[in-house]
Amino acid sequence: MRPLMLQGHERSITQIKYNREGDLLFSCSKDQKPNVWYSLNGERLGTYDGHQGAVWCLDVDWESRKLITGAGDMTAKIWDVEYGTVIASIPTKSSVRTSNFSFSGNQAAYSTDKAMGQSCELFLIDVRNADSSLSEQEPTLRIPMTESKITSMLWGPLDETIITGHDNGNIAIWDIRKGQKVVDSGTDHSAGINDMQLSKDGTMFVTASKDTTAKLFDSESLMCLKTYKTERPVNSAAISPIMDHVVLGGGQDAMEVTTTSTKAGKFDSRFFHLIYEEEFARLKGHFGPINSLAFHPDGKSYASGGEDGFVRVQTFDSTYFENIFE
């Protein structure tokens, strides 16, 4: 099970994401330049050059035509995936922390940080006819976050709702037609949420939190279904599209890391059974915390992006699929 090591970033990885078919893997980091890789052999296909600050988030649309990125230079940019050109650059008043295309690809949502006297806000834009004029247009929806800033975000079914994860551990569902909150999870997590990822059918999602747990939620009622416990903050978690498995990645906060030993087990990818909540495997590799995880859409491999600036793509052995959990 030899991993592909993708080395194209000079600083730590902030997010990685596969497109729908899984042939492309997108990565962004604090070095200002998102990359796109051919996931089969790890070849770098291109770089999206244009941001002036750390890129915090990215998402690719259903057809792999458009890419949206959000960065610390106070812009969200929409790119042409194939040509690497900027279609639109949208100025904001603080760093863009999350960005996602809707399933239809007609809309995109992004959220800004609570910083420099600005409150955290959630924005919706229409990207059907995205061009340079998008920077002057008003967003179709703008929701100020009065309590805690958004740290991760997902689109709900039929593009009618947005699920937000917050810095205080709250999760909320927003109706985008009414522009108001419809469901609040309360305090299932006791610390900030670092990442949220949907299951393949969208009926549930997994959260990764600083409170050292990952949890499985129903995406309509926000009922907590399962809890996966670790000893360290969880930075990212993903659900396998074909097996009842969840992978967790994390480690200490970046500023608390003093050792770079891979033997300590701090920086492993940890596999849990989705239903039984039991850990059954660990994979070593990164010299530092794992910041982002993603399963390949076919479920036969997964990728991890770390604080060490590497993206590792691991293909599973046949024993992984034959292993019956008892």
Swiss-Prot record:
Entry annotated with the keyword Cytoplasm: yes
Gene symbol of the encoding locus: eIF3i
Keywords of this entry: Cytoplasm, Initiation factor, Protein biosynthesis, Repeat, WD repeat
Function summary: Component of the eukaryotic translation initiation factor 3 (eIF-3) complex, which is involved in protein synthesis of a specialized repertoire of mRNAs and, together with other initiation factors, stimulates binding of mRNA and methionyl-tRNAi to the 40S ribosome. The eIF-3 complex specifically targets and initiates translation of a subset of mRNAs involved in cell proliferation.
UniProt-listed PANTHER family: EUKARYOTIC TRANSLATION INITIATION FACTOR 3 SUBUNIT I
Renumbered ranges of WD repeats: 8-47, 50-89, 145-184, 188-227, 285-326
PROSITE patterns the UniProt entry points to: WD_REPEATS_1, WD_REPEATS_2, WD_REPEATS_REGION
Family listed: Belongs to the eIF-3 subunit I family.
Main location: cytoplasm
Subunit structure: Component of the eukaryotic translation initiation factor 3 (eIF-3) complex. The eIF-3 complex interacts with pix.
Organism, scientific name: Drosophila melanogaster
Cellular compartment(s): Cytoplasm
Alphabetized GO MF terms: RNA binding; translation initiation factor activity
HAMAP family in the cross-refs: eIF3i
Name listed for the protein in its UniProt record: Eukaryotic translation initiation factor 3 subunit I
One GO term of the biological process aspect: cytoplasmic translational initiation
InterPro entries assigned: eIF3i, WD40/YVTN_repeat-like_dom_sf, WD40_repeat_CS, WD40_repeat_dom_sf, WD40_rpt
Example of a GO cellular component annotation carried by this entry: eukaryotic translation initiation factor 3 complex
